[in-house]
Design a protein with these regions (language model features):
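Acidic, metal-coordinating helix/loop segments flanking the phosphotransfer/catalytic sites
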Residues: 5, 29-46, 54
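Conserved acidic carboxylate
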Residues: 8
């Protein structure tokens, strides 16, 4: 079972994504900010994250810190810098099925 890290500062959204991904068969870790994410990303196949997360480290800095070492899927409701080293950008609101398919695709790439 692949381990996924979900990074989201909105507690309701975080819990909803955790439940959806667990129901889809993933082992899910969560983080409310970049600092927690930096402590928890190792061992994960994919990081699913909101780009706008609170300081001390914002989403772009988190991406720079982990890019190339784990697959990164960004969920964004706005404009995303085109040069961010992420694997995929999904627009919010993102249907659960699309998120699950995206995660499965990136896990398959790693195998």
């Amino acid at each position: 079972m692949a381990r996924i890290l979900v990074v989201e500062d909105d507690a309701t959204q975080l819990e909803m994504r955790r439940q959806i991904l667990q129901h889809a068969g993933f082992d899910v870790a969560t983080a409310r900010d970049a600092q927690e994410a930096l402590e928890r990303w190792k061992g994960c196949a994919v990081v699913v994250m909101d780009l706008r997360i609170p300081e001390p480290e914002d989403g772009a800095r988190l991406i720079q810190a982990i890019a190339g070492r784990v697959r990164i899927i960004v969920l964004s409701g706005g404009q995303v810098e085109p040069d961010l080293p992420v694997d995929e950008i999904l627009t919010k609101p993102c249907p659960s099925r699309r998120l699950i398919e995206s995660i499965q695709r990136w896990i398959h790439v790693e195998e």
